[in-house]
Each structure stands twice: as C-alpha cells, then as structure tokens.
Amino acid sequence: MVATLFETGVINNQGKFDRDLKTARIRETDNVYEYVLAYKETTHIDRDITINEIDIENLIRAKGAIYSGCKTLLSEVGMSMENVEQIILAGGFGSYVDLERAMIIGLLPEVEPEKVIYVGNSSLLGARMSALTNSIRQQVVGVTNMMTNFELSETPSYYDNYIAALFLPHTDVN
C-alpha cells in the first residue's frame, strides 16, 4: 500500500501526505494525518480502515534499518549489491512480501526477482534437517565455525546509512 501511495504522489519521499490533494481520503484525526483505505460502510468492522503518517514513519524506520544493515555489512566486507548472488527471505515475513513493492520503497534492494527466494521457517527446517541427517549436522558445524559477529551499532557508517535510508525509497537511488 505504501509503495502505491508513494508512486501516485499521495505521500512524498518522507512519508508525509500531500495536503494539497483534493480528496476526502486524506484527513487529520487527533493531530495526525491519515489516509482512508476503506470507509466503514464498506467494511465489516464498523470503522474506517486507515493508514497514518505514524504508521508510515514506523515502516520507513524498519526498512531503513534493514537497508542500512545490508549496505553497511556489504561495505565492511568490500562488496556491493552487484556481488550478491541471492537474497533469502525467511519466516512468515518473507511469504507476504511483494518484491516489486518492497523494492519501490527501498525495503529490498533493486535486484532481479530470480535472486530472491523464500524459505519459510528456516530455523525450524534447519533444526529438523540437522536432527535427522548427520551430514547436514556436520555442514551446520562447519558453517558455524566460519561465522563471526558483526556489531552494526559499533560501525560509524551504519548510522550514516540509516539516516540516508529514512526516505522513500532512500537517498541512494542510483
């Protein structure tokens, strides 16, 4: 929904509604601007369904953290998005992501859709596989021995990347 609002100019790159638009769908309620997605007469919950600027701001912060984390990590290991062969989306989150829309708002980097795969509940699947198969368990041990901890909060460029990502899609739009 946010991607559509952004693409159509209903919200700007800061997630604020265009107050000059001549539509009853944009209104101010309790000092917060909101957009009516569905009026209560068309819902089964006896109230309007809305999205407000606080909702959008929270989404922008969350996607900013994801984007800046990826960008910082890649930079710290001397890579860029061009080097990434695959993006794996795990958990329930991944199954609901519309790739095109996620890329429009900067939640995911703009890559070929074939590079993105959904794996569902990867932790549960991994636990089952390693419990049932010795060779998988050995691979897991091998991978864990190659892991390292990377603390984003201790990396100065993370904060710069985060601030730059607090826009739709983000300030790095090349």
Model-predicted segments: where are they?
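Helical "lid/coupling" subdomains associated with nucleotide-phosphate turnover
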Residues: 1-174
